[in-house]
Amino acid sequence: MIRRRLVSNAKKVGYAASAYGQRALARAGLAPARPPVGIVIERADWAVRWWGAFIAEEANKISPDIVWITTDPSKLTSGIIEFGSQYQWQAWRKFLSPRCRMVTTFFHGKYEDGAEASEHIDQFLESVPQLDRIVASASIVRDRLIGWGVPAQKIALIPIGCETNRFLPATDAERQAARARFGVCEGEIVIGSFQKDGVGWGEGTEPKLIKGPDVFLAAIAELKKHLPVFVLLSGPARGYVRAGLERLGVRYAHHYAPDRDELAKLYHALDLYLVTSREEGGPMALMESMSSGVPVVSTYVGMAPDLITDGVSGGLVQPDDVAAIAERAMRILSLPDGASALKKAARESVMVADWSVVARRHIDEVWKPLMQRSGA
């Protein structure tokens, strides 16, 4: 604990020095010209980085040079700053220029998630007066924020996006090739799980329980009683799930896709995708599955209730309800014509989260109103 505090304090000193140095350059007229909006992303090649990169790419197509992305908030000395992570916002908020308009996402988190989450939420709520806008991706989270006393007019409900032109339903040839690549046998039911559900960025043998890896394994064990199950995993830190599948005697493959095109091909092998989390902001795999024509059974978390109509465009169950997850999965897998109607409905539902739509909404609902208030 003492070492963590020392590291944390050292980081804060570094943040302050960097931020005040950049502000001094700006006052001297030596800071480079920037677009009016800066999105702060994470260095890790994962969801927050992708979120910011795709919004910026699409927004600049709509309104050229309106936004840029950075991993260094100290470089943002004027204009609008939008943080892709509420944790980044918390780390940097005391060192940012008061000339800036402040925006952050709040994608997930609730008091029931434990002491650390509760402390973070309390600190976040203390910071709300400093914020001009808060972006929530899901109705569940927006309603939660309002219940905690956040003014509704500060919250923009904008989904996390999906590359619907990249994540497309597989052709028969693409499906056969993907399944052959991972050694799937004839008649096996391939269930996908593409996420990070271990603690840290190593092997991930300690489960990140908020992601429900224990629920996933319990659901697979139940489905194995009735079906020849094969599990396809992607994402880092999957050691806990891999060990669990080996104990269950379930055949599986784990492939960490090096890029988004490779990730899209993994969905071609799937018959079903399971989201078994206890808390989510999206997840991105929910939208990617629906866009790819892969049926989803999800717990009632994140964007799932906004996108899925139970029995029409997927399956929706309460968190931790293993029996319900297995029942919905069996029901969907037994639908006629390969669940074609459900797949079609799912893809239509997810189009509201195409990145071009998401970027347009950030421009119209968040950035432009703040630019007008600033006289920009």
Feature roles, as predicted:
Residues 229, 235, 239-264:
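Nucleotide-activated donor-binding/catalytic signature segment of Leloir-type glycosyltransferases, i.e.
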